[in-house]
Structure formats: C-alpha cells, structure tokens
C-alpha cells in the first residue's frame, strides 16, 4: 500500500504515508559498471534491480480536517532505520477498527549494489557525504505504532534481502 487512511465520526482524517525518495525502481545493475563503494558490478549482480535508496525514508502521519482541508497535525519519523523504506502492511482487523501497527520492510543500504551513475543522476538531491558508503545499512523489518510513533526494528543479517511482509504477528495471535 502506498499510503493508509483512517477516519471516524470525529471529523478527523488520518493519513499515514511512507516515503522513500531516490529509490529508482527503473534502474538495473549493468555488468562492469563502477559501484559507489568503488567495486565493479560482476555478472552475479548484473541485471539486478537496484534495491537501495540514496537517502533515508520517512513515515509521516498527517491529521486533517476533511471539511476544511486544514492540517491539524503532522509527525514525521526519519532515521537510519528507515533507509530503503518499502511498502507497508497491517495485521488483519475488522473494518471499523483503527490500524494500530504498520509493518514495513527496508532494503537498507548496500553500497556494493548501487552504481555510481545512479548517484550522479541524483547528485542535486543527495548529499553523498551523508551516505553510509563505508558501513552500509542492514535491511530491517519495522513495526510502527501509529498512535505513539514508536518504532520497533528487527535487524536482518548483512546480505539478506527482505520483501514486503506477508505474515504479520499480532497481539493475542497464535
């Protein structure tokens, strides 16, 4: 889901929007090209879609008065854990129940999988000094509590790739 919306009869609309700037899903690794870590792309990764964003992602919660369009409040979460934020999901619930927790996977940042040409394409939007080129960022599974903004992060081992969550643990579930 690209964004989530929930509302009730209290004249409030809540939009929860994950955003991942500089993740270009139209780009692919080409064999032999130079990557941002200085290595060259091998045949093992040639043809792979570039899985990494060049900046941190964010999760925004906007509260809006739907009648006037007035923004009543906004919270934005952005940190090293949201690097490569992907589409989210939530645990099954009744339609009249509010979403409590959203789950997201992240790609992290793997400098050996990002061509220098992609960084050059986005050079006006990216401060390469802020990119974790030496250390990278591991992929994660995130649990975002909408009401509080609390983020629980489950770290994946280096070299793993995590896809959108399809099994979502829930309180009281078996």
Give the label of every model feature segment.
Residues 1-174:
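Beta-propeller domains
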């Amino acid at each position: 889901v690209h964004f989530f919306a929930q509302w009730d009869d209290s004249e409030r609309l809540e939009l929860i929007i994950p955003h991942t700037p500089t993740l270009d899903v139209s780009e692919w690794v080409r064999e032999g090209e130079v990557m941002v870590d200085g290595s060259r792309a091998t045949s093992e990764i040639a043809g792979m879609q570039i899985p990494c964003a060049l900046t941190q992602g964010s999760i925004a919660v906007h509260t809006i008065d739907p009648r006037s369009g007035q923004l009543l409040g906004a919270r934005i979460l952005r940190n090293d854990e949201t690097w490569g934020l992907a589409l989210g999901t939530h645990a099954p619930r009744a339609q009249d129940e509010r979403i409590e927790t959203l789950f997201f996977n992240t790609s992290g940042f793997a400098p050996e999988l990002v061509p220098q040409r992609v960084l050059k394409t986005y050079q006006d939007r990216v401060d390469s000094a802020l990119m974790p080129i030496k250390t990278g960022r591991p992929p994660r599974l995130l649990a975002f509590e909408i009401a509080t903004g609390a983020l629980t992060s489950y770290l994946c081992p280096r070299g793993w790739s995590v896809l959108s969550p399809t099994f979502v643990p829930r309180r009281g579930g078996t």
